[in-house]
């Protein structure tokens, strides 16, 4: 199997787990400057999947690394969300993280906790496939967008 096919197969296999990660992140309120719980959740997941380095910087952002090559590639996603506004305008609880009809519902699902969940799964796949080479891949999960 070609490497691309392996990656796609793993991504498909982890689809439900990625949705569950997103659901958990949505359930974790993380308004700007109040992201500590979300940062701890992201850190825990990166450690669970064996990332080479995981730390929280002085601002509270999670910095994770896979690989140890000289060239560096960084991919960023923010873990904070904007306020809910008028809760009456929501059809579902904005912090339910409900998974229904192939979608994950809640505050931050598309901006940007969905991207964060995908980044965590991508890092997991890199580790499982033994990524090593010219690059250090940094996944940064930043606060206070």
Give the location of each predicted region.
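Acidic/histidine-rich catalytic neighborhood of metal-dependent amide-processing enzymes
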Residues: 112-145
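Acidic/His- and Gly-rich active-site-bordering loop/insert found
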Residues: 2-109, 128-134
């Amino acid at each position: 199997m070609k490497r691309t096919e392996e990656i796609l197969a793993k991504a498909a296999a982890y689809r439900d787990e990625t949705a569950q990660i997103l659901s958990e992140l949505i359930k974790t309120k993380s308004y700007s400057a109040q992201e500590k719980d979300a940062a701890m959740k992201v850190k825990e997941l990166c450690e669970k999947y064996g990332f080479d380095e995981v730390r929280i910087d002085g601002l509270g952002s999670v910095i994770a690394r896979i690989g140890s090559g000289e060239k560096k590639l960084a991919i960023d996603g923010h873990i904070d969300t904007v306020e809910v506004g008028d809760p009456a305008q929501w059809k579902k609880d904005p912090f339910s993280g409900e998974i229904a009809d192939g979608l994950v519902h809640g505050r931050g699902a598309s901006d940007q906790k969905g991207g964060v969940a995908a980044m965590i799964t991508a890092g997991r796949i890199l580790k499982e496939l033994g990524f090593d080479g010219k690059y250090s891949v940094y996944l940064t999960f930043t606060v206070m967008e």
